């Protein structure tokens, strides 16, 4: 799958333009998804120097993205007159999701088992349903 991942508020705490503290298990989960052959795209509002800082921050923690703010590494805005900021990703992981950002353990479970929120809620409801007398 192609997975677009936001930076501020998703991988690190939201301190833009500074880089916030790492969100627990974000890097571990993303590296694990890469080992399972998912393509990760960093999808951020950051540009220029601020974007370079975010990419370096991730690289220093062992996370190298397939592409950054584009669909594929070779894509060049100046050579593409129909360039769109909208990615062709299968999944978007972003703190601005409806319902907010789940914890990274839940994100991994949803991606690896291809579960929707509805599937996940149904699963947890059945697991925690009290026994009837």
Q: What is the meaning of each model-derived region?
A:
Residues 51-133:
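C-terminal cap/substrate-recognition subdomain and adjoining C-terminal extension
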């Amino acid at each position: 799958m192609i997975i677009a991942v936001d930076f501020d508020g998703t991988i690190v705490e939201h301190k833009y333009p500074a880089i916030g503290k790492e969100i627990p298990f974000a890097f571990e989960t993303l590296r694990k998804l890469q080992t399972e052959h998912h393509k990760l795209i960093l999808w951020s509002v950051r540009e220029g120097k601020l974007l370079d800082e975010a990419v370096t921050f991730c690289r220093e923690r062992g996370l190298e993205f397939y592409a950054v703010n584009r669909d594929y590494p070779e894509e060049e805005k100046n050579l593409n007159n129909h360039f769109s900021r909208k990615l062709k990703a299968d999944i978007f992981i972003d703190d601005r999701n409806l319902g907010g950002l789940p914890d990274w353990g839940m994100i991994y479970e949803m991606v690896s088992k291809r579960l929707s929120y509805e599937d996940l809620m149904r699963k947890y409801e059945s697991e925690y349903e009290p026994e009837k007398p």
